[in-house]
Amino acid sequence: MKHALGHGRMSIIAFSIAMISALLCGPGMSLGAEAPRPLAPPTALSLREARVIIDGAVAYAREKKLRMTVVILDEEGQLISADRMEGASFHLERFAKGKAFTSLILRDRTETAAELNKTRPDRYFGIMNMYPGEVYLVGGGVPLAIDNRLVGAVGVAGLPEGVDEKAALAGIDAWNKYRDSMKK
């Protein structure tokens, strides 16, 4: 007896293998037909650079005998690295991330945004509604740029008012020194 798919049992097996291959590989592909895709290019801000920023900010906080959390985001708002100093509260990571995210989307220091928000609270209404619970209009978030190109942001939380940004700037200063040393 002949099957609708061909002349006997082998055609059914071949058809089954082809169907399984199509399901495993996706449409328009077969096993071994396509070379592996290259890895995505690394972010402009490397993990090593993020750690340099964090280490600079942590050194500043230690010098002042303070505890804090610091977060580094890439240009798309994705986490590169974060540190919570021993004894710093667990909720500070979210706060630091919110500050970094806010400085990233505003392309400005969150301390500047906080000052502008005092005189005109409606200024950031749209962005706060677009990102509910993610925008923090308090100091401690600073954008990161290389050759005037935004590459990420740093956010610091847990320090007294005005000191968060100083810690972030200390981290950025350490990063700038690191970048300068790499050029030599």
Where do the model's predicted regions map?
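N-terminal secretory signal peptides that target proteins for export/translocation
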Residues: 1-9
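A periodicity- and composition-biased signal for non-globular, repetitive helical segments
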Residues: 8-9, 15, 90, 105
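Bacterial N-terminal signal peptides
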Residues: 11-28
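Flexible, solvent-exposed loop/hinge segments and secondary-structure transition points
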Residues: 31-184
